[in-house]
Curated annotation (Swiss-Prot):
<dbReference type="GO" id="GO:0048599">
    <property type="term" value="P:oocyte development"/>
</dbReference>
<dbReference type="GO" id="GO:0003677">
    <property type="term" value="F:DNA binding"/>
</dbReference>
<comment type="function">
    <text>Major constituent of messenger ribonucleoprotein particles (mRNPs). Involved in the regulation of the stability and/or translation of germ cell mRNAs. Binds to Y-box consensus promoter element. Binds to full-length mRNA with high affinity in a sequence-independent manner. Binds to short RNA sequences containing the consensus site 5'-UCCAUCA-3' with low affinity and limited sequence specificity. Its binding with maternal mRNAs is necessary for its cytoplasmic retention.</text>
</comment>
<feature type="region of interest" description="Disordered">
    <location>
        <begin position="33"/>
        <end position="85"/>
    </location>
</feature>
<feature type="compositionally biased region" description="Pro residues">
    <location>
        <begin position="185"/>
        <end position="195"/>
    </location>
</feature>
<dbReference type="InterPro" id="IPR012340">
    <property type="entry name" value="NA-bd_OB-fold"/>
</dbReference>
<dbReference type="Pfam" id="PF00313">
    <property type="entry name" value="CSD"/>
</dbReference>
<feature type="modified residue" description="Phosphothreonine">
    <location>
        <position position="76"/>
    </location>
</feature>
<dbReference type="InterPro" id="IPR002059">
    <property type="entry name" value="CSP_DNA-bd"/>
</dbReference>
<dbReference type="InterPro" id="IPR011129">
    <property type="entry name" value="CSD"/>
</dbReference>
<dbReference type="GO" id="GO:0005737">
    <property type="term" value="C:cytoplasm"/>
</dbReference>
<dbReference type="GO" id="GO:0007283">
    <property type="term" value="P:spermatogenesis"/>
</dbReference>
<dbReference type="GO" id="GO:0003723">
    <property type="term" value="F:RNA binding"/>
</dbReference>
<feature type="compositionally biased region" description="Polar residues">
    <location>
        <begin position="65"/>
        <end position="74"/>
    </location>
</feature>
<feature type="region of interest" description="Required for mRNA-binding">
    <location>
        <begin position="217"/>
        <end position="364"/>
    </location>
</feature>
<keyword id="KW-0694">RNA-binding</keyword>
<feature type="region of interest" description="Disordered">
    <location>
        <begin position="155"/>
        <end position="364"/>
    </location>
</feature>
Length: 364
């Protein structure tokens, strides 16, 4: 009986270990006691021992066989996708000439100098761009240096630079950067204290030294002119009352004290520029004709002027809108003066002249 039990135990152990090793799960084999197969019989005990471990094992390992395709798919990982950095490099530091490059679309082609092959280039592949250009680009007909890698649709260029690693020149259609400096936003500065409180601090006082130390730490605020549209709109604005005080006052010391007040009022409150000086409108100067001597004159009087002077009738005024009556006949006093005995003949020569034009006079 001992030999039959040993044979049954030998046949039971492989049946239990085969499915466990095929499934890849470690199982512990428990030895069958010698008294149990005797109850069911030798043949029955052997069959029970053989079927016992198979029934005790889970059904899942029995279905996972090496030939099952489900096991192969779940067991082997999928291959990783190839990234841009893992592209195989075909050549490095190759010189070529740019065939064409579209700045708007951001791509073009480079013709290799060694193999005369066209290589695709994208704007992201440009490593050293022109610092003056706003966009990355290469110029048409420019000689560049690049590396060739294998892309999805053919050869592609990467690490594009100028010959020797210098920056590329770039396309002439690419916009340039602005020449002005970049605007750096600054926090709003605290408004300085009014200058009125600083004027009495110049004298002796307990807090004068402390106030000077605080004011020296603050940086004086620089006045900035208002914008163009503000100047055009508020040129004739109301004038502050502080600006009129130095003009009305007679003391010369007042303008020196009130000058900083005007500046700070324009900076902090309104920033109104000083009004422009406009001269007062005046009529153009029109010289008036010189008036002839009246009855008070002595030697220069004429005969017709004496007639009305003797009476009560004054001499009529000359019209202003007729300038041709202002012409006077000037006569040299030396050679044309008549001697003493010729004075009685003066009425004969002067009568026909004054009869035609009463306004003309003769000066000696």
């Amino acid at each position: 009986m001992s030999e039959v039990e040993a044979a049954a135990g030998a046949t039971a152990v492989p049946a239990a270990t085969v499915p466990a090793t095929a499934a890849g799960v470690v199982a512990v084999v428990v030895p069958v006691p010698a008294g149990e197969p005797q109850k069911g019989g030798g043949a029955g005990g052997g069959g029970g021992a053989a079927s016992g471990p198979a029934a005790g094992t889970p059904s899942a390992p029995g279905s996972r066989t090496p030939g099952n395709p489900a096991t192969a798919v779940s067991g082997t990982p999928a291959p990783p996708a190839r990234s841009q950095a893992d592209k195989p490099v075909l050549a490095i530091q190759v010189l070529g000439t740019v065939k064409w490059f579209n700045v708007r679309n951001g791509y073009g082609f480079i013709n290799r100098n060694d193999t005369k092959e066209d290589v695709f280039v994208h704007q992201t592949a440009i490593k050293r761009n022109n610092p003056r250009k706003f966009l990355r680009s290469v110029g048409d007909g420019e000689t560049v240096e690049f590396d060739v890698v294998e892309g999805e649709k053919g050869a592609e260029a990467t690490n594009v630079t100028g010959p020797g690693g210098v920056p590329v020149k770039g396309s002439r259609y690419a916009p340039n950067r602005r020449k002005s400096r970049r605007f750096i936003p600054r926090p709003p500065s605290v408004a300085p204290p009014p200058m009125v409180a600083e004027i009495p601090s110049a004298g002796t006082g307990p807090g004068s030294k402390g106030e000077r130390a605080e004011d020296s730490g603050q940086r004086p605020r620089r006045w900035c002119p208002p914008p163009f549209f503000y100047r055009r709109r508020f040129v004739r604005g109301p004038r502050p009352p502080n600006q009129q005080q130095p003009i009305e006052g007679t003391d010369r010391v007042e303008p020196k004290e009130t000058a900083p007040l005007e500046g700070h009022q324009q900076q902090g409150d309104e920033r109104v520029p000083p009004p422009r000086f406009r001269p007062r409108y005046r009529r153009p100067f029109r010289p008036r004709p010189r008036q002839q001597p009246t009855t008070e004159g002595g030697d220069g009087e004429t005969k017709p002027s004496q007639g009305p002077a003797d009476g009560s009738r004054p001499e009529p005024q000359r019209p202003r809108n007729r300038p041709y009556f202002q012409r006077r006949r000037q006569q040299a006093p030396g050679p044309q003066q008549a001697p003493g005995p010729r004075q009685p003949a003066a009425p004969e020569t002067s009568a026909p002249v004054n009869s035609g034009d009463p306004t003309t006079t003769i000066l000696e």
